């Protein structure tokens, strides 16, 4: 059994091979304490963002007595909570959006090529794992990493691609693209 793990055979080897497409970023580790009769029992909570850099991203939270175990649990939770986000030209957002969770608000703006990721802290990890290369983001209110991540995911959830907007409004994608500021009527919607 131990020999199989070292060689990469068996069930675990196949799972690791499949998961190699994902990039994960550790956003935050927090040491937590539980007060018991004999004193304090310490543990760790980890927040991880995972994505394939092609439009799929997820976040997870894990708690354990040791840091590596908390990170592993958070990574598994993130893999179960993957969502797909439509990207314009595979590098930025389709339009400006805002998201909110608790007292935290985030504002995300699409940016021209070459701008880079202008975002702070936890939001940067989301954009890097998502595959966004050009975005301007601002966080207002709570700077708690958990709330910032959830507010960012709330914003990304409300983004619409031109194809979904045109289907909802019963117009052609090319008509919608030509109305975009600086848009090209021949542009292909993703």
UniProtKB/Swiss-Prot annotation:
Sorted UniProt keywords: Ribonucleoprotein, Ribosomal protein, RNA-binding, rRNA-binding
GO cellular component terms, A-Z: small ribosomal subunit
A GO MF label: rRNA binding
Coiled-coil parts of chain: none
Pfam families from the UniProt entry: Ribosomal_S5, Ribosomal_S5_C
All copies of domain S5 DRBM, residue ranges: 22-85
Subunit structure comment from the entry: Part of the 30S ribosomal subunit. Contacts proteins S4 and S8.
Described purpose of this protein according to its UniProt entry: With S4 and S12 plays an important role in translational accuracy.
HAMAP family tied to this protein: Ribosomal_uS5_B
Similarity comment: Belongs to the universal ribosomal protein uS5 family.
Name under which the protein is recorded: Small ribosomal subunit protein uS5
Source organism of the structure: Nitrobacter hamburgensis (strain DSM 10229 / NCIMB 13809 / X14)
Gene symbol of the encoding locus: rpsE
């Amino acid at each position: 059994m131990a020999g199989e793990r070292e060689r990469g055979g068996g069930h675990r080897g196949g799972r690791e091979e499949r998961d190699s497409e994902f990039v994960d970023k550790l956003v935050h580790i927090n040491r937590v304490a539980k007060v018991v009769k004999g004193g304090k029992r310490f543990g760790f909570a980890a927040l991880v963002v995972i994505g394939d850099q092609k439009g799929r991203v997820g976040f997870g939270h894990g708690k354990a007595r040791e840091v590596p175990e908390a990170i592993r649990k958070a990574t598994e939770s993130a893999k179960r909570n993957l969502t797909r986000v439509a990207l314009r030209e595979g590098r930025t957002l389709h339009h400006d959006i805002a998201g909110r969770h608790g007292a935290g608000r985030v504002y995300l703006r699409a940016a021209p090529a070459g701008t880079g990721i202008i975002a702070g802290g936890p939001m940067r990890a989301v954009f890097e794992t998502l595959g966004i290369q050009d975005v301007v983001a601002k966080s207002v209110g709570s700077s708690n990493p958990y709330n910032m991540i959830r507010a960012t995911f709330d914003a990304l959830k409300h983004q619409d691609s031109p194809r979904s907007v045109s289907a909802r409004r019963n117009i052609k994608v090319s008509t919608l693209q030509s109305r975009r500021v600086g848009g090209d009527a021949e542009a292909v919607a993703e």
